Amino acid sequence: KSFQIIFLITCTNNVNISTCLESISKNNHSLNCLILLLLQNNVKLSLESYITPYTSIKVLHKTHTIPLSQARNILLKSERIHAGSFYMFPDDDSVFDQHFFEFFTKIITGNTLIAVKGTQSKSVYFLKMPERKWALISDFDKAISVNMVIKGTTIQKVGNFDEKLGVGNYYGAGEDNDYFLRCNAIEQFVFSNDLWNYHPLPCKNTLQTVSKILIRYKSYGRGVVYMLLKHRMITEAAKVVVKGYLGCIKKLMMLNWKMAYVYLIAGSVRFYTFLKNIK
């Protein structure tokens, strides 16, 4: 069976995944869709209610949590890449509406970066695309897993995610940006705000402990700087380092001692990563 769109989703718990699957199943009345789902940590789900004439589901299992890029690569390897299909990598808390499926074939003709709206407030954008048509290398920061629609022919050529990058690794970010750059080198992405999905808006740092914020910022900084240097984007990597220190200065001026400390440490981690990996 051929599919028009294939979703590759990894899941480490069953908190949000049911809502994600339900949004696809209930709103898809037009596309031949396959959901490839990797359940980790012995997560168990009843999937029968999500299978429809338009939506098929294939499930793989892991008894423990593995890094995100490795998990996605397992899904990529599990299924022959369908040349005529489009692929997406939603998070387990992504949500889709009927508009997405109804207008997909009218809007998507090649590699595309779509908009992402906030789940909590659907008029607020989590990520809005520029009005210009073509994505450039410098648009790497506008590419995240949930908004990339990628042709099967492109994925055939690009292959796997870089398993040094992403959640669960020392370089804990940048895997989506890296994949975007590699795909964009084969077929240039276009921007579209006419198609979207939904994602929870970011949590405010005031609601998190310093230790949790630090872990996130350090991991992000290492990943993004490493990714940019991998692609020889030295100026962009240097800008990421500088932004860390500028963030510290800004928070000091606001007398926000907690976040000033976080940005100071994060900036230093970025600087160390820059020096360690520049060639």
Residue ranges and their predicted role:
Residues 160, 166-178:
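Acidic donor-binding loop at a coil-to-helix junction in glycosyltransferase catalytic cores
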Residues 212-223, 229-279:
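Non-catalytic, C-terminal membrane-associated alpha-helical segments of glycosyltransferases
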Residues 133-153, 171-172:
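A recurrent flexible, glycine/aromatic-enriched loop bordering the glycosyltransferase active site
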Residues 11-28:
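Short, well-formed alpha-helical segments that are part of the catalytic scaffolds
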Residues 62-79:
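Glycine-rich, basic loop-to-helix element that forms the pyrophosphate-binding segment
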Residues 84-95:
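Short beta-strand-to-loop acidic/aromatic patch adjacent to the donor-nucleotide binding site
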Residues 190-201, 213:
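Catalytic beta-strand/loop signature of glycosyltransferases that borders the donor
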Residues 95-128:
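Conserved donor NDP-sugar-binding/catalytic core segment of glycosyltransferases
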